[in-house]
């Protein structure tokens, strides 16, 4: 559901997370004395743009749900249409936040699968979908994005940065807004938060983007420096003219994610993503051999399983190993793997489902 364990490099843990000089959620107001933090946040923005394939990113938002709600409002500001489609396969907490924001901004949200979405009335401001979705399925949304654009609607993609290290980036199939959580880039779970959300857009939407952006300029002596730019939040201009009422960010956690990407490099991130995916493939093969059915053939790190035996029995064995599964309303189980999963974890999972060892 968008939360994963991860390995925090000791260098980042000691020098960033536990260093009081970095501990603030705010983006710096005094660029003259904050060039280091601003440069790190610019690295975060650059990382998000590189991975999502979009033109511009902000310096983080509060969480993925908030980012999705901000995407809804951006779509409404862009074309003034009051209907917004949401794919029901988005994470449930994201859907809940979007519906709450829509209720109080006068936007009608409709939960529809892509095949059910009708853009012919040209009254839809945008569409939000999850890639990969909350059940783990990886789907090609190119056709949906094209249909949305033909009617003047915007396409918003809630996604996973680690998955995008090996999947096709949203920018390549026409998405206008990409958003999600950067938590699994070296930020501990923290019992559910706080985590930094990312938000990236096409160049034509930059001036409508919520949150803060770090830009490059020159000082009085002509030296290249960093500063906050395009500050159209309500702290800086009249409330009714503001692009967003979000007045803070998650700067510390965004800096951790940026440093995680720098620490590993592009090849290192791809290696982590492939390792996670390979572990998921091993688990999926073991489950199928034991008679369990997978709901989706294309996935990255998450499986939805129709058990070939008693679900209660499986959950009982999982409790013995202190492993928590997601129980769907239809009785299927969800499992997500992450970079901390090792061979013993896979063996435990296979034992829980009555399968043979991964060895």
Q: What is each PLM-predicted segment?
A:
Residues 1-43, 49, 237-238, 359:
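N-terminal entrance/gating region of PLP-dependent enzymes' catalytic architecture
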Residues 29-33, 50-69:
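Short loop-beta-helix segment that forms the pyridoxal 5′-phosphate
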Residues 290-319, 337-340:
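Conserved PLP-binding catalytic core of the aspartate aminotransferase-like
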Residues 317-321, 326-355:
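Noncatalytic alpha-helical scaffolds and linker/capping helices
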Residues 185-290, 295-297:
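Active-site C-terminal subdomain of aminotransferase-like
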Residues 10-11, 142, 146, 343-359:
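Flexible inter-domain linker/hinge segments
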Residues 19-31, 47-53, 79-81, 109, ...:
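Gly-rich Lys/Arg/Thr-decorated short loops/hinges at beta-loop-alpha junctions or inter-strand turns
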Residues 66-69, 73-223, 287, 304-305:
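Conserved PLP-enzyme active-site core in the AAT-like
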């Amino acid at each position: 559901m968008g939360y994963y364990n991860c390995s925090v490099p000791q260098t980042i843990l000691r020098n960033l997370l536990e260093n009081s000089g970095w501990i603030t959620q705010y983006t710096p107001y005094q660029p003259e004395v904050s060039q280091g933090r601003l440069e790190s946040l610019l690295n975060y923005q650059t990382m998000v743009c590189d991975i999502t394939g979009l033109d511009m990113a902000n310096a983080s938002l509060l969480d993925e749900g908030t980012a999705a709600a901000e995407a809804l409002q951006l779509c409404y500001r862009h074309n003034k249409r009051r209907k917004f489609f949401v794919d029901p396969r988005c994470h449930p907490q994201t859907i809940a936040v979007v519906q709450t924001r829509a209720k109080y901004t006068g936007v009608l949200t409709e939960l529809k699968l892509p095949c059910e979405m009708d853009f012919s009335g040209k009254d839809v401001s945008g569409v939000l979908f999850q890639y990969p979705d909350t059940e783990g399925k990886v789907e090609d949304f190119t056709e949906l994005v094209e249909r949305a654009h033909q009617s003047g609607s915007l396409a918003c993609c809630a996604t996973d940065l680690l998955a995008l290290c090996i999947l096709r980036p949203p920018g390549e199939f026409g998405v206008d807004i990409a958003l999600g959580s950067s938590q699994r880039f070296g930020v501990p779970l923290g019992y559910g938060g706080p985590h930094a959300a990312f938000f990236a857009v096409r160049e034509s939407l930059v001036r409508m983007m919520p949150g803060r952006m770090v830009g490059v300029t020159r000082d009085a002596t002509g030296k290249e420096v960093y500063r906050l730019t395009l500050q159209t939040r309500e702290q800086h201009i009249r409330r009714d003219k503001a692009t967003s009422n979000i007045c803070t960010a998650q700067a510390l956690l965004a800096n951790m994610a940026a440093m995680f990407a720098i620490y590993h490099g592009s090849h290192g991130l791809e290696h982590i993503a492939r390792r996670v995916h390979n572990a998921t493939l091993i688990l999926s093969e073991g489950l199928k051999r034991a008679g369990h059915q997978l709901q989706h053939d294309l996935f990255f790190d998450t499986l939805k399983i129709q058990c070939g035996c008693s679900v209660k029995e499986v959950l009982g064995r999982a409790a013995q190993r202190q492993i928590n599964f997601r129980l769907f309303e239809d009785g299927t189980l969800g499992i997500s793997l992450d970079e901390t999963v090792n061979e013993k974890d896979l063996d435990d999972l296979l034992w829980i489902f009555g399968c043979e060892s991964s060895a």
